[in-house]
């Protein structure tokens, strides 16, 4: 089998395993829904590195995330997995799959001549880790709250969003370009990485606060990716 075929098989096994883990933790270990949902969210976002590892063709590599646009919507509608879709859940899982798919189609070129995957991965990591930790810390430890566009958040959560986004953007743009995962990506200057990290984190924090009903899963990755591209 080619790496692309193996990548497809492993991707769906990985995704299925994530869903099962989230469901088992919720149903049998009584882990709260908001935590199991974020565990699955982080696991899904981190699989972008698995995609970069396995696939040599972006046309095939986008299939797993693209297919989960429809699958996540189905899961959301029928509430098949209570570990990720509670009664008050948003379409965030659908939006996240859409943003990753669109960014991959537009920017990921594993065979060259120029691959912009580091920028899109920076956007995905900001959403993967920044949003997850901001939501959890904001919910459980946030005491200073504000409401925008019908969504209530905390200043503590937004601060976490900024700091975590800054760290993951910096690490992504420092370590990924020119590596074995993205050999055709241009290596940015240190100044460009610092600018992208600070500006990207600021944009991620503001956009996350302004985006209602799970749409931050769409807006944050796209906006941070654009910042990374402009800074680089």
Model-flagged regions — what are they?
Residues 62-66:
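Hydrophobic alpha-helical transmembrane segments in multi-pass integral membrane proteins
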């Amino acid at each position: 089998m080619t790496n692309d075929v193996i990548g497809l098989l492993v991707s769906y096994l990985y995704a299925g395993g994530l869903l099962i883990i989230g469901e088992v933790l919720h149903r049998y270990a009584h882990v709260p829904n908001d935590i199991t949902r974020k565990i699955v969210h982080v696991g899904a976002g981190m699989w972008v590195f698995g995609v970069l590892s396995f696939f040599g063709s972006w046309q095939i590599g986008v299939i797993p995330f693209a297919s989960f646009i429809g699958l996540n919507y189905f899961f959301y509608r029928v509430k098949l997995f209570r570990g990720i879709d509670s009664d008050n859940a948003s379409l965030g899982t659908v939006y996240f799959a859409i943003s990753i798919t669109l960014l991959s189609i537009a920017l990921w070129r594993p065979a060259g001549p120029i691959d912009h995957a580091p920028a899109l991965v920076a956007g995905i990591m900001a959403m993967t880790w920044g949003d997850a930790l901001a939501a959890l810390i904001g919910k459980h430890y946030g005491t200073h709250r504000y409401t925008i566009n019908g969504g209530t958040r905390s200043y503590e959560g937004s601060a976490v969003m900024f700091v975590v986004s800054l760290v993951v953007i910096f690490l992504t743009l420092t370590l990924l370009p020119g590596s074995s995962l993205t050999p055709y990506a241009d290596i940015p200057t240190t100044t460009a990485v610092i600018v992208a990290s600070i500006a990207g984190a600021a944009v991620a924090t503001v956009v996350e606060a302004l985006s209602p009903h799970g749409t931050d899963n769409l807006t944050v990755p796209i906006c941070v990716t654009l910042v990374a591209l402009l800074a680089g």
